[in-house]
């Protein structure tokens, strides 16, 4: 058998030295035992820190989900609060049995103003595009009619559209001028 050429390393050298003298061996075992205990304590401390960080991350994630769920659930609350007076006015009009058309018209006008104010507070914008160029993203053409206006110009609005910010809630139903 060939004998391998081994260079003594500090660990193997220390082990060889410890094996030569019993007191030195006992000291080395004691030192290594203490070092193992210190490293185990440090590992336990790091594991505890890891568990705490993981738990904190999970708590943050759960709280964020709860906040998003609440925001979705109550996002319309402000707008709904603005619509309650409109409903009150409509119920009062229905409860009025006098049959006075002037009074009824006045009540409907008041209700329309209340609804317009609620829309304004909710940032809902009315789309009434008479005279504007037809935009398929904001308008829905119902028909084309001969007209003196430029082709593809909105001639008549059959039903107004509504937008919130830059998003179309409902496109305006329009009649568009036909090409000449």
UniProtKB/Swiss-Prot annotation:
Keywords carried by this UniProt record: Chaperone, Cytoplasm, Stress response
PROSITE patterns: GRPE
Annotated spans, Disordered: 1-30
Pfam families, per database record: GrpE
Cellular compartments annotated: Cytoplasm
Descriptive protein name: Protein GrpE
Gene Ontology terms for molecular function: adenyl-nucleotide exchange factor activity; protein homodimerization activity; protein-folding chaperone binding; unfolded protein binding
Stated role: Participates actively in the response to hyperosmotic and heat shock by preventing the aggregation of stress-denatured proteins, in association with DnaK and GrpE. It is the nucleotide exchange factor for DnaK and may function as a thermosensor. Unfolded proteins bind initially to DnaJ; upon interaction with the DnaJ-bound protein, DnaK hydrolyzes its bound ATP, resulting in the formation of a stable complex. GrpE releases ADP from DnaK; ATP binding to DnaK triggers the release of the substrate protein, thus completing the reaction cycle.
GO BP annotations listed: protein folding
Organism placement in taxonomy: Bacteria, Pseudomonadati, Pseudomonadota, Betaproteobacteria, Burkholderiales
Protein source organism: Cupriavidus metallidurans (strain ATCC 43123 / DSM 2839 / NBRC 102507 / CH34)
Gene3D superfamilies: 3.90.20.20, Head domain of nucleotide exchange factor GrpE
């Amino acid at each position: 058998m060939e004998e391998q050429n081994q260079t003594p390393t500090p660990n193997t050298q220390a082990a060889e030295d410890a094996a030569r003298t019993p007191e030195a061996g006992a000291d080395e075992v004691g030192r290594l035992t203490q070092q193992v205990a210190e490293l185990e304590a440090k590992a336990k401390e790091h594991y505890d820190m890891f568990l705490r960080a993981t738990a904190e991350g999970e708590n943050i994630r759960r709280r964020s989900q709860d906040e998003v769920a609440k925001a979705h659930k109550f996002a319309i609350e402000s707008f709904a609060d603005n619509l309650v007076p409109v409903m009150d006015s409509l119920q009062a009009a229905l409860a009025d049995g006098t049959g006075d058309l002037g009074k009824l018209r006045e009540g409907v006008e008041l209700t329309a103003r209340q609804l317009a104010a609620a829309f304004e507070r909710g940032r809902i914008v009315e789309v009434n595009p008479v005279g504007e160029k037809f935009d398929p993203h904001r308008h829905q053409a119902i028909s084309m009619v001969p007209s003196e206006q430029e082709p593809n110009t909105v001639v008549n609005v059959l039903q107004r559209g509504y937008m919130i910010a830059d998003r179309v809630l409902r496109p305006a139903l329009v009649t568009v001028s036909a090409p000449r």
